[in-house]
Amino acid sequence: MRKRMFALLVAVAVAGLAGTTIAPAGAATGLPAKASTGASPPGLGGFPALPCQDGAVAGAGPIKHVIYLQFDNVHLQRNLAGVPSDLEQMPHLRDFITSNGTLLSNDHTVLISHTANGILTSLTSLYPDRQGQAVSNSYRYYKPDGTSGVGVSFAYWTDSVFDPTTPTPTDTSYNMLTADGRNDPAPWVPFTRAGCNWGAVGTANTVLENIGPDVPKVFGPGSPEAAEVASDPGQAFADFVGIAVHCAKGAAMCSTGNHGRPDVLPDEPGGYDGYQALFGHKYVAPQITSSLPLKDLSGNVIQDASGHVGFPGFDGMFPSVTLSYIAQMQEHGVPVTFGYLSDAHDDHGVAGEIHKSYGPGEAGYVQQLRSYDRAFAAFLTRLERDGITKDNTLFVITTEEEDHFVGGTPLNPGCDGVTTPCQWTHVDCTAPSADCSHNVTEVNANLRGLLATQTGNTTPFQVHADMAPAFYLDGNPAPDAPITRQFERDVGSLTATNPITGQTDRLSDKLVDRVGMDALHMVTGDPLRTPTFVDFLDDDYFGFTGPPDCASPCVTAPGSWSHATFAWNHGGYTPDIVRIWAGVVGPGVQHRRDGAGRRDRPGRPRCGRCPGCSRRGSRRRWGATTTLARSHRSWCSPVGR
């Protein structure tokens, strides 16, 4: 999932909405340069305030709307050479970006590369050490007795550590926290302070994430909403989770009469009193449509798999759903909208109730991408009809990370997916076989069992299960403690026989202790959630903790569709995971091709003294999660556009 477009987004949107001049980006990346004129109130990085009134843009600047869309694991890179990538199979979206703006193909996500970490970095402009989510989508925290508990990365912005196993976790620090332990500044504040309503559709931690602590916290423990949680939790989830509008001060949309609640941000720099927000489909939908129930872009009522009308769940955020919410908000006084979209390589059922992985080019995968493309075609046509276009709207479309596909080869190797569907097997494997060589699944490794049987090490520990498992040794020993060093050596020696390839693999690729994690922006302001070390595994493997033996096989490839399956591995640092893409379209955005041109060959970039530019032969403009958040808006331009 994509990173640091947010600071750029604020900069460009503020400049455009305020009627300032966006200077040519020099030898640019295709992104707008910093605004050159206008007043500069504090807290907005030197950019002028947005002239919104009650949620409607009122300035003379070219930008009237901001639409930020972030996919979960949607790929620009091909996962199988003969099969077009996700973005190639969505031509309406891809052509919109490449024909009207810039498609950056050499951006990079953060470590550990997961959904929460990627999105939250993109919302905050901060590396994980300054926003609290170095290990995600969950993490562990040390308790006073030396054992560790579970913290969930997805929790509302002002929540403390959310441990679903207890209402009173011993770690009471903010889930989203700065390096000095305060609550991170919220991403909607630059817009709402300037008078613009800000909408969120499934966007991590800007919406209520659960009906446990979040609903009573926002609405009150004795509220009708809390009573609904107790009496009908399924409907309560659909009513209150996943959708929000954070309003400008005094905006009618978020009035108390419309069920607006105080938008409380206790540590916001400069204070944040008097603002209100709407939380949940139940209260947002009536403000953005006069025709209930709200429908997706295909004309279907938005509901979950059980028929609860409302938010369908975070794994049911197909483009037809997310883009419907976004369009309705934009048409009804919410000019700044952020949306999350589910991945395309898994079968999520009706609304995320199942999880079955497809292989590249498999029929269901290709069909799902076609439906995604149809949704974008309908969305862009609708916006055009509304007068929301590339000439007055800043579009940012990106992903939070890409993936490493774990699987064999298709049964029909010459397939392209589009005209000839690729055929794969979906079976459970514990040993190499003909079927397993064509399987679609990651390889699961029981780290506790392998440690005990291969090294005899039974030191108590827990992990955040992952392609890059974070180890938490009981007692929280120091990095240089003998028990830590021996444990690390033993973990580094583990091997496994891959049921798909038949090869014996060394499990560990790179092992990083706390000193290394600090260098990688992975040590946060909460020392209790810092792991003992992180092990970046061979990228085909997913490490977890099971029994301390291998009576049941410690290494399996569970690909049968009789249960949930996972084949798209991420968390690690390999290029197929961390190299991501971002598309930018709008006023002031230069139309650039990001890639090899006729004279753009290795070793010959035209590059001066500027950030984000390498003299080592990269054909693409290099970006990182926070690179675009810098005050520099002018990068190098390779020869040959």
Q: Model-derived features: where do they sit?
A:
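Short, structured active-site-proximal loop/turn typified by the sulfatase FGly-forming signature C/S-X-P-X-R
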Residues: 77-130
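Active-site His/acidic residue clusters
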Residues: 326, 330-374
